[in-house]
Design a protein with these regions (language model features):
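Membrane-proximal, proline-rich intrinsically disordered regions
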Residues: 4, 25-72
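Conserved, well-structured interaction surfaces
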Residues: 46-47, 51-52, 86-157, 180-183, ...
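Alpha-helical solenoid repeat scaffolds, predominantly canonical TPR units
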Residues: 115, 185, 192, 239-242
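Sec-dependent bacterial lipoprotein signal peptides
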Residues: 1-23
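Extended ligand-binding clefts on enzyme/binding-domain cores
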Residues: 48, 52, 240-270
C-alpha cells in the first residue's frame, strides 16, 4: 500500500512538473500570478461547490465498475471463467491473482478515497441557509462513498491503509499509515457513518433522463452490509428496514422466478 502511495505522488509530481515547465513568460516573474492555485486557498463553502464535488467523485467511482463486478462475481459460487477467458479473468476466478493482473491495481480506489478526504477536509458544514445546514447532505454522501470504496478495496485486498486526511504532498505520501483488516475497518466505517443516519438523501432531479436519486449510495445500505459482515444481524436488519421504509421499496412478481415440480429445467417469470 505504501509503495502505491509513493508511486501515486510521483505521478502527481510529474504532472505538476510538466505543467510548471510551460508558464507564460510574464508569469515567470510575477509572484502574485492568479494562474497559480494553492491548496490552502481552495475551500468548498457553497452549495454549488459541494454539488460539483459529489458529482466529480462519482465520475471517478465509475472507473471501479468493471473491477467491482469481476472481483465480486468471479470469486462467488455461481460463476466461473471459461478456458477461453483472458488470463486475468481466469486468475481472479482461480484465486491466484498475479501482480501484473489488470484488475489487481488499487490506484483508482485510493484516488477516490483521496478525493473524498479532500472534500471532507475542505467542506464547511457550518454554513446555514434558513436554519438548514445546507452542506451536510453532500458531506454525508461523500463519507458514504468513501466508506463503500474502502470496503470494496478491503474485500479485494484483505487490508487497507487507513488514511483520513488528503494526501497532498510527498511528505504525506511517505508517512506510515495504519493497516486495517476487515473487522477493524468495518467497525471504523460504522462509527464514521452512524452520525449521518437520517441525513437528507440527495436529489438533483433528472439528469440526462436519469433519476439522480439512484446515483447515490444510501447510508443504511452500506451500514447494513458492514453490520452483516460483523455478524450483528439485528443491527443489519434495522438498517436495511430503514432503507426499505424510507424508499418505499417493494418486491413484485416481476422480480422473481419459479420452477414447477414437473420440469425444473426451465424457469418462468412469476
Amino acid at each position: 500500500m505504501k509503495t502505491f502511495i509513493k508511486n501515486y505522488m510521483k505521478a502527481v509530481g510529474v504532472v505538476c512538473a510538466c505543467m510548471a515547465a510551460f508558464p507564460a513568460c510574464t508569469d515567470m516573474m510575477e509572484t502574485d500570478s492568479t494562474t497559480v492555485g494553492f491548496e490552502e486557498d481552495n475551500r468548498l463553502d457553497s452549495p454549488n461547490d459541494s454539488l460539483y464535488s459529489v458529482l466529480g467523485i462519482l465520475s471517478q467511482v465509475q472507473r471501479l465498475g468493471d473491477r467491482y463486478v469481476l472481483l465480486g462475481e468471479l470469486r462467488g459460487d455461481l460463476m466461473e471463467a471459461t478456458a477461453d477467458a483472458h488470463v486475468d479473468i481466469q486468475e481472479i476466478s482461480n484465486f491466484s491473482v498475479s501482480s501484473g493482473n489488470e484488475y489487481a491495481s488499487f490506484y483508482d480506489y485510493y484516488n477516490v478515497i483521496n478525493n473524498c478526504n479532500y472534500a471532507i477536509a475542505k467542506m464547511d458544514t457550518n454554513i446555514v441557509f434558513y436554519e438548514d445546514k445546507v452542506m451536510i447532505p453532500e458531506y454525508a454522501q461523500i463519507k458514504v462513498i468513501r466508506a463503500w470504496t474502502y470496503w470494496q478495496l478491503a474485500l479485494a485486498a484483505g487490508k487497507v491503509s487507513w488514511i483520513e486526511e488528503p494526501v497532498l504532498s510527498l511528505e504525506a505520501a511517505l508517512k506510515e499509515y495504519p493497516q486495517k483488516g476487515l473487522e477493524d475497518l468495518a467497525q471504523l466505517l460504522i462509527d464514521d457513518l452512524t452520525p449521518y443516519v437520517g441525513a437528507r438523501a440527495l436529489d438533483y432531479g433528472t439528469i440526462d433522463n436519469f433519476d439522480s436519486r439512484k446515483m447515490f449510495f444510501p447510508v443504511d445500505m452500506v451500514l447494513g452490509d458492514l453490520y452483516l459482515f460483523l455478524g450483528r444481524y439485528a443491527d443489519a436488519a434495522t438498517a436495511y428496514y430503514r432503507l426499505i421504509d424510507k424508499r418505499k421499496l417493494t418486491l413484485t412478481g416481476a422480480n422473481g422466478y419459479y420452477w414447477d415440480n414437473a420440469a425444473r429445467g426451465s424457469a418462468s417469470g412469476a
